[in-house]
A protein has these predicted regions:
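Interaction-mediating elements
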Residues: 20-157
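Sec-dependent signal peptide recognition
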Residues: 2-10, 18
Length: 157
């Protein structure tokens, strides 16, 4: 039992000590979002030691921006490499079937996805639920929400 605890303590010491010093920062895969913006939001700094847990924090911060569909970080020869796949930008949101301008305005204001912002797939289902709730509260009990997403060539929807 004592040996088990010693092994665990040694494991934690070894994993916490292993940190890499970043001399260079390389960003790959970005088109719309600048390297500087990614470095700023990830709070990545040169000449700083980064452990795996600190790299995970950087990943979390970058995902929280909703700018990226996928982010990965690797460490190669004192260079931190951040690979990103950007979320598309919402070009236009069209509501059809609702004639009441007040309800349309309410629908536009309440949804999470907005024009000229990043398109996040997980927010589509949430917005559908929000729309259904608003329509039911306004007497449209049998309304059907159909989402259609058209991808364009310039990484917009």
């Amino acid at each position: 039992m004592n040996l088990f605890f010693k092994i665990i303590i040694i494991f934690f010491i070894i994993t916490s000590v292993k940190a890499n010093i970043v001399k260079n920062i390389q960003i790959q895969g970005n088109n719309r979002i600048s390297d500087e913006t990614i470095i700023l939001f990830g709070e990545i700094k040169k000449n700083t030691k980064y452990s795996k847990s600190e790299l995970n924090i950087i990943l979390k911060k970058l995902y929280e921006t909703d700018f990226f569909e996928n982010v990965s970080i690797s460490f190669e020869n004192e260079t931190i490499v951040v690979n990103v796949i950007e979320n598309p930008i919402i070009e236009e949101i069209i509501f059809s079937g609702v004639k009441n301008k007040t309800i349309l305005k309410t629908l536009r204001n309440r949804i999470q996805l907005k024009e000229k912002n990043s398109f996040v797939k997980s927010k589509v289902r949430k917005d559908e639920n929000i729309l259904t709730t608003i329509l039911k509260k306004n007497g449209y009990y049998f309304s059907i929400i159909e989402t259609s997403i058209k991808k364009n060539e310039n990484n917009t929807v």
